[in-house]
Amino acid sequence: MAVQWKTKEVSEQLGVNPTTVQRWVKFFGIQCETNEHGHLLFEKEHLTVLKAIQNQLKSGKKMRDVVIEENEQLIQKPETQPMVATEQYEQRTKQFMEKIAELEKQLSQKADDVVSYQILKHRAEIDEMFKTLQSLELRMAKVEEQLEKQQEEFPLAAGDVPKRKRSFMRLFSF
């Protein structure tokens, strides 16, 4: 069995952070074994590939420009998806646009329905307030009539003081 290292040990040998090693493995599709805990296990060939990547990055290359020539069997090439025909793309785009227009129309209709409902509710509230106001006006008119009758029947209740009492009160006021 070949010697295997964990991510931390490889990162120490390369002088980089363990997450950097994990990022390189993921980005370049390096095929590594994992242990029962899910930790990556590296062999000598993996270390050689990672050193080649590190050297190219140190020389100023960007990750997308790095070329791996050694141990290519360790690298999983991403599958390329076929291009979509222009007519098919335009047809799908047209379908999406029609669907979006339909959804916008439904949304607008729903908004109109909500506003109509709110207006009807407000109208009902206004009608109820108007009825309450009319009722209050009638009650107020009745109270005013009763007050006028009381003033006619009982003049003293309206604040009229007989003249005799007024003169008596003047004697004691300063």
Curated annotation (Swiss-Prot):
Main location: cytoplasm
SUPFAM superfamilies: Putative DNA-binding domain
InterPro entries the record matches: Chrosome_anchoring_RacA (IPR023522), DNA-bd_dom_put_sf (IPR009061), MerR-type_HTH_dom (IPR000551)
Biological role stated in the UniProt entry: Required for the formation of axial filaments and for anchoring the origin regions at the cell poles in sporulating cells, thus ensuring proper chromosome segregation in the prespore. Binds in a dispersed manner throughout the chromosome but preferentially to sites clustered in the origin portion of the chromosome, causing condensation of the chromosome and its remodeling into an elongated, anchored structure.
Keywords for this protein: Cell cycle, Cell division, Chromosome partition, Coiled coil, Cytoplasm, DNA-binding, Sporulation
Compartments reported by the entry: Cytoplasm
Coiled-coil regions listed: 84-157
GO MF term (any one): double-stranded DNA binding
Any single Gene Ontology cellular-component annotation: cytoplasm
Name by which UniProt lists this protein: Chromosome-anchoring protein RacA
Entry superkingdom: Bacteria
Any GO BP annotation: regulation of DNA-templated transcription
Source organism per UniProt: Halalkalibacterium halodurans (strain ATCC BAA-125 / DSM 18197 / FERM 7344 / JCM 9153 / C-125) (Bacillus halodurans)
DNA-binding residue intervals: 7-27
